[in-house]
Design a protein with these regions (language model features):
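Conserved catalytic alpha/beta core of Sir2/sirtuin-type deacylases, generalized to analogous enzyme cores
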Residues: 1-319
Length: 319
């Protein structure tokens, strides 16, 4: 796959390289102004209105604002049995838990995938963000793997999910550089555990409140090409499969940046923490400012953190 797409521009690798150089460039010389909430909203609104293009860089904080929380009440609602039996405290750590058998491990993952990939987010933050940039020349690059941008109506051809997708499996056989849609399997595995659909078609706990923590052995997912085991298509190490869709999205992102050099581009970074890979992945933004003055400050504008205005009410105030 890498050889097949070697001639395409790789926005992912370019971004990492530029990000590292940008960190070195700005080290010790970067200051951030402090704006009031109203000032920040007003400034963002102005930049959105005047920008010729917008690049949205999003990390887990955006999905958290949308209600896709991995701990607390939501976790206990769907994983209370796993918490009680294994002492798991949240969905994130549960993904690394050494379950006793494959039937239990895949029961966990069926729930994890379903409630973070195949159901609407509790709050319409993604939809509000889409409405906020409606009609603008926009591209999204994100480390989120929950598919929420697409669910909210963002253009699939202008999305780059750098770290994978909960909706995809990959083979453990490193020779197979493909991914496989898992929706049908997830629905079967949820039914096998005893979850029932409500009036909206969403799986919920049955009236008795008890479900199985295992799936049948025959339902353990296998690679359709060679029958090998599968795993999640999530970037955990160098075994992560960058498939055809990944390479095309990477090229589309790189081309979008090149097409808009010298233009007034708003780089909107939302929910991004300093300890996540997205800090480097999303950083064609900062090196562009360092390397090319046409991007900043005369033409471009970079908003680093919008955690104060990522809920629906405040996003609507920008519209």
């Amino acid at each position: 796959m890498k050889q097949k797409y070697s001639k395409l521009p790789n926005g992912y690798l370019e971004s990492i390289d530029r990000g590292i150089r940008a960190v070195r460039h700005f080290r010790g010389g970067l200051t951030e102004g402090i704006l009031s909430r109203d000032e920040a909203i007003s400034r963002l609104k102005t930049e959105i209105e005047t920008a010729e293009a917008i690049v949205i860089g999003a990390d887990a904080g955006l999905s958290t604002a949308a209600g896709l929380t991995y701990s607390g009440e939501r976790f206990l609602k769907y994983f209370g049995d796993f918490a009680e039996r294994f002492g798991i405290r949240d969905m994130y750590s549960g993904g690394f838990y050494p379950f006793p058998d494959a039937e239990t491990r895949w029961a966990w993952w069926a729930r994890h995938i379903y409630y973070n990939r195949y159901v609407p987010a509790p709050r319409p933050v993604y939809e509000d963000l889409r409405n906020l940039v409606q009609g603008k020349d926009c591209f999204v690059i994100t480390t989120n793997v929950d598919h929420q941008f697409q669910r909210a109506g963002f253009d699939k051809k202008r999305l780059f999910y750098t770290q994978g997708d909960y909706g995809l499996f990959q083979s453990v056989n490193p020779a197979i550089r493909k991914t496989y849609d898992n929706e049908e399997w997830v629905m079967q595995a949820m039914e096998a555990q005893g979850f029932v659909r409500n009036e909206k078609g969403i799986f919920e706990m049955p009236a008795g409140g008890s479900v199985s923590m295992k799936i049948p052995a025959l339902l353990i997912p296998k690679c359709p090409d060679d029958g090998s085991d599968v795993t999640m298509n999530l970037r955990a190490d160098d075994s992560f499969v960058e498939d055809e869709g990944w390479y095309r999205a990477s090229a589309a992102y790189a081309n979008f940046l090149r097409r808009h050099e010298g233009m007034h581009v708003l780089f909107l970074e939302i929910g991004v923490g300093m300890n996540t890979p997205v800090f480097y992945v999303l950083n064609p933004i900062r090196p562009k400012m360092a390397k090319n003055s046409r991007f900043y400050p005369e033409n471009g504008y970079f908003i680093k953190e919008l955690s104060r205005i990522t809920d629906s009410e405040r996003l609507r105030r920008c519209a």
